[in-house]
């Protein structure tokens, strides 16, 4: 099964969400189709046109938004003078609701990958009546231990690369690399220090999934503006526990029981270990849980593609 051809947007714009922030959005596919919202990962990557291919453009109204301070949303975190104090998970949930109202959507299908799955779940738990169905890939609970795994403990798989990552934060910060990098990226006034930290951060991000079959280096890590935007936003969120209460996503899972959903997760996902998806499936038993043997944390896997297309095809027929 192949993805659908990527269609160009038939509508786009900037939504003023307050506080000087404007969120960029696009709509493609059928203007009269089932509304579907794609929530990108990161946080801080921005939207990818290729993700539209997961949806039948004849049946879906495919909506994308660049989360605050990234992609084409303004102001951009690529500008070091831009402060990120008004960029939290709750701000993003509010932005999604404002976009839904702006576009005249009653209920929509949500797709989220990795961090996007976290955001989709938090939004759905607060606004379950606005969610028609959910497709979650590479599930992330974003608990403190999950984040420590990514940036501390995962160094056991990549000791040489992690040594370089750790050294970039300074020897005295070995036990809290998230806070150290957040300070280097969001508090320092030295541009050369900030750029070096951004480069080191993205080098580690690129390593995380490098054992997966079909892995390719991140295509945007050669863009200094993307590198700074992404690393600043990611460290801002993850050094603050993603602005979530402890175990929030699992504790609020009971609010999802009336929402159809599918959790698609690679059994060999090292970035977001399998237990995260398993725990969510246990807390949300009405969702379908698709375990993909031999699959890691890469969307290039044919079994990931097939599982996504099966779900989006089925959800196009929901009332």
Residue locations for each model-derived region?
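Catalytic active-site module of serine/aspartate enzymes centered on a nucleophile-bearing elbow/loop
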Residues: 287-319
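Conserved hydrolase catalytic core segment
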Residues: 106-145
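Conserved alpha/beta-hydrolase "acid-adjacent" motif
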Residues: 245, 270-276
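A catalytic-pocket lid/entrance helix-loop region that shapes and gates access to the active site
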Residues: 129-183
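Short beta-strand/loop motif that positions the catalytic acidic residue
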Residues: 256-257, 263-265
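Conserved acidic catalytic loop of the alpha/beta-hydrolase fold
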Residues: 90-108
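Conserved HGGG/HGGXW glycine-rich cap/lid loop of the alpha/beta-hydrolase fold
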Residues: 17-75
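N-terminal cap/lid segment of alpha/beta-hydrolase-fold proteins
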Residues: 2-23, 234
